[in-house]
Structure formats: C-alpha cells, structure tokens
C-alpha cells in the first residue's frame, strides 16, 4: 500500500461517520474534561485545552485510528498532590517530561509488551472501567428531582430505540440525537436541572503557547520525575489496553509502539499549551466506534469541535443537561462491560476467573488502573507457571544388564518444575552408568540448571557415571554458562560450602 492509499484509508474512508461521531465525542468530552480538571485541582480550561491538544495531535501521530485520547480521570488522580504542593507550572513541566518518557518507551518498543497481558486481564480491565464509568455518573443521579431520572431514562430510550427508526436511524448517531433532543426539551420547558455550565466556567479564548515557569534545576527534576514516571506508566497502560479493545471492536490491528510515541508527543504539546497530561479514553473510544467513527479524522474532528464549541458556542454548550450526558455514559458503561465474561464463568477455568475478578476488584477499589493490571498480570503469570510446571514427565528404563539406566525428560524445566525434576531420579540405585536424555526437554532459568547440577553431582557421588545428552541449543547455552557439574573446580568449591 503506497502513501496516498494509506492516507485515504486512515483519513478519508469514512468521512460522514467520522464527522458525526467526532461531534458526539466532542460534546461528551466537555463535562468530563471539566470534571477531571476539578479532580486535579486546576482551572477547567486546563483539562479542556489538554483534551483539544491531545485529540488533535494523536490524530496525526497515534498508532490506532479511531481511538480517542484526551484528559482522563486516571491521570488526574495522579496529579492532585503535585498541584497542591507545587502549583500548575510544575504540573505542566511534569506533563512534558511524561511525554518524553512515553516517546522513549516507544523507541524501546515497550508497546510490544502488551502480548504478555492475558485476555483475562484485558477482560477484567474492561469490566472495571465499565463499573467506574457507571459509578462516576452516580453523583449526577443522587439527591436530584424526578425530572433528572425521567430525562436520563428518556435519553437511554432514544439511544437504544432511535437506530430502529427507518431511513435515518442508522445515519445519525443516537447519542447525538439524545443530546440535541434533551437539550431542546430542557430549554423549552425551562427545567431547573444541572447543566454543563454548572460544572465550571468554559474558556472564551484560544490556547496559547507557553513554557512552564519553573527553574531548570536538578531539584525541579527530582520533584516532577516521580509524577511524570507514574503518569507515563498509567497513560501507556490505559492507552495500550484501549487500543486492544478498539482492535477487537473494529477487527483491525494497531501499532502499539507508534501509539507510545504519539501519546508522548501529544502530552508534550499539551504541556506547552497549558494543558494537563492525558491518554486514551476507553469510554470515548467506545462512543466513537459505536457512533460510526473509524479513522483518524474522527479524533481530529473531536478535538477541533471541542475547542470550537467551548470557545465560540459556550452559551449553547452550557445549556446541555448533565442528564443527557449521563445517559450517554451509561450507554458506554453497558456497551463496554463484557457480559460474556459473566455468562461464561462456569465454562472458563477457575484460574481465568480469579485473574479477571481480581483485576476488577483492585481497579474498582483503588481507582488505579496500573495496580489492577499489575495484580492481574502477576496472578496470570503465577497460574501459568503452576500449570506449565505440571507438564514435565520423566520416564526411565534399565538395560538388560542392569548396570545402566536411562532417564528421558519431556517438558519444561524451570523454577516451578525443578523440584519435580530432581524428585524423579533414584539416587540410591546401584548402577554403573546413568544417561539423562534431554532431547525433548527445555531448560529455562538458573533454577533449572541448579536442579540438573544437583542431580548429576548426587549421582556421581553415589559412584555412577553420568552422561547428559540431547540438550537443544538454547538449553545448552544456559547450562554451559551457569552449570557447574562439568566444572571440577566449581564442584569442589560448591562441596566445600
């Protein structure tokens, strides 16, 4: 595929769907950007400018067309202490350093590490985010009049029923119809309900380039680096997970390492325009895909429309009832949750269910995506090690003379299976020679090598001649490097201890 064809496919292959979905996303981004600014303890314009800049930049630099990136709650939570103790300028500097670290991660190809995240962890991550998205709407549904419940229910009805309207149901995104209808209804009837303008003051000027006013000293670096590192890790985790989810929704693939670099460039740009750090947003990405967005154009439209709406149409945007946006986000929550993971609980292995539920529990309890993913990956690794450790078989046969025994090892020898490997040998049997056939085995780590050393040395101590044969190239390399059973000096030193 040449450059012109690639540009056509990534930008202009779905123009109508991208324009409409981008507008829906822009409207949904506004209250969230304001809310995340409040969480971080900064002016609402910081979150709005960040969402504009990140969405526009990532449209050009990202590795996952159709995925929406902007200011997020997960990132905002990490900024609270920095803003409180040092102020906005240090936040902008930390945002830029976060971008540098993410670009470095892209060049180091850390995005490829996503292949080590199991499907059960991704499912747990998705379900946890769906729960968090729903929980985030509860304050808008608590201690309110019945009008809010009625409008939210009406909004959900529009979202789910409008697609069945002949001719136009599949042309216009139902979330956009929901927002427009409920806004018009609230303005005509004059309902006293919370609107976007109640979330905070919308900016009336375009963002301008500025350099953070912080001293360029080692002390400043020591202050911002821990926050920048945390932001970079959480941002990349959420972005990589979201990219995987959008891959599944669209049956396409993405360039994870390019996405790392793109997120970094976007965050540097955000910091230079007075915005906070951000990353991919699973909720908005799902809205975009469900509304028909597929290419980079949808993300660009979302960012540009966001800025135009808040700067030039703030009076109209401010009248959007929060109930309409709550309805949209509830739809996102329902659509994001993997209901198959609940229906198939009895069919899936217990280990898979434990990993999924643990990931959900940790993310929901801590509101920290990184903790949940870390726990999920560690549990998945432990279960895998335990499972693969059982796939080790050692058989033996004795020659007719009774003076020689051959042990045939089949499977993986590593820290989890090393005890089973050692326990498979009879060290007290009176034989002249023992052959250990490793042609169908693989040694993975120094624990496995130490187990082989232990077996060979104990057999030789009992007076048997030991021959190790059949090691594959990779196993032979690690055994030659770390093994001591064929190194007399090392064996003597080991025995002395």
Where are these regions (language model features)?
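Intrinsically disordered, low-complexity non-transmembrane regions of multi-pass membrane transporters
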Residues: 1-16, 194-210, 391-408, 463-497
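Transmembrane helical cores of multi-pass ion-transport proteins
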Residues: 1-383, 387-392
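Glycine-rich loops and low-complexity Gly/Arg-rich segments
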Residues: 140-141, 183-186, 232, 399, ...
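The feature marks cytosolic C-terminal regulatory regions of anion transporters and related permeases
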Residues: 335-485
